[in-house]
Amino acid sequence: MKPCMTALRQVIQPLSLNFQGNMVDVPFFRRKDKVVFVMGATGTGKSRLAIDLATRFPAEIVNSDKIQVYKGLDIVTNKVTPEESLGVPHHLLGTVHDTYEDFTAEDFQREAIRAVESIVQRDRVPIIAGGSNSYIEALVNDCVDFRLRYNCCFLWVDVSRPVLHSFVSERVDKMVDMGLVDEVRRIFDPSSSDYSAGIRRAIGVPELDEFLRSEMRNYPAETTERLLETAIEKIKENTCLLACRQLQKIQRLYKQWKWNMHRVDATEVFLRRGEEADEAWDNSVAHPSALAVEKFLSYSDDHHLEGANILLPEISAVPPLPAAVAAISR
């Protein structure tokens, strides 16, 4: 039975609080509204899980990926397609048209709060999903109004690092087959080699710079082919490094939010193919996540849902990331 969201909240008079030296008027909730977060490193299946949950509960999705907020480069940024979204409304996905300016954590905080409020007003559950942990931290840790108004449940989709790296490599090859290079070629600006801001930071854009310049300069075919192969390998390498950094950040956040973070291990899904993979997904990821969300939505505010005891995997030191990639991982 789907929980009735109207019954989950009761608003009474605003409350004035002193927050960092300033008096802030905030709504006081006897029962807070509830927000679900789906976290995980790149490639682990966050979008799939968010959509699965949104088809089981009355929910809408708010994107928290700092590159997917921009319009364009749908292959490079691996946005969900209309077919994959299964009709579930998505917010902050491809909505920023100024692709040369950074969409900061403060920008996300402001727009995400608006999206969450609009979703809650329609008696639906906001599911915030994406890999930009600085966005989530800005919303949960740095915004007093958000903390006072909402209870949060965090789902962490995890995959064994060697298995994830193998999958990421395969995914990059598929993205190339789908037209990644042509997509980057269309936005390539030979007058600029600055990839420090906006959508140009996306992994897959700076790595192709040298190859695209070689095309324009009519280098020999064998040279351009070699540069393309090098660029693709660099895309794979940087994506794996990004995944490691994201995992490190999630482990740090887990220590802060341990009481209501639920880790689901999707490794088995990536070791299987076809129907077996779908079955493993349902059993290992979708079903336990749905149970956690159902309990979270059903319990009153004074019940703390304990996340499962998590034995955190050891993460070895990660080599320094290129500046643009490091910016994405924050």
Swiss-Prot record:
It catalyses: dimethylallyl diphosphate + ADP = N(6)-(dimethylallyl)adenosine 5'-diphosphate + diphosphate; dimethylallyl diphosphate + ATP = N(6)-(dimethylallyl)adenosine 5'-triphosphate + diphosphate. The keyword RNA-binding does not apply. Coiled coil: none annotated. One of its GO terms (biological process) is cytokinin biosynthetic process. Gene3D superfamilies: Crystal structure of tRNA isopentenylpyrophosphate transferase (bh2366) domain, P-loop containing nucleotide triphosphate hydrolases. InterPro entries: Dimethylallyltransferase, IPT, P-loop_NTPase. It comes from the Eukaryota. Disruption phenotype: No visible phenotype, due the redundancy with other IPTs. Expressed in root primordia, columella root caps, upper part of young inflorescences, and fruit abscission zones. Belongs to the IPP transferase family. This is Adenylate isopentenyltransferase 5, chloroplastic. It comes from Arabidopsis thaliana. The lineage of its organism: Eukaryota, Viridiplantae, Streptophyta, Embryophyta, Tracheophyta.
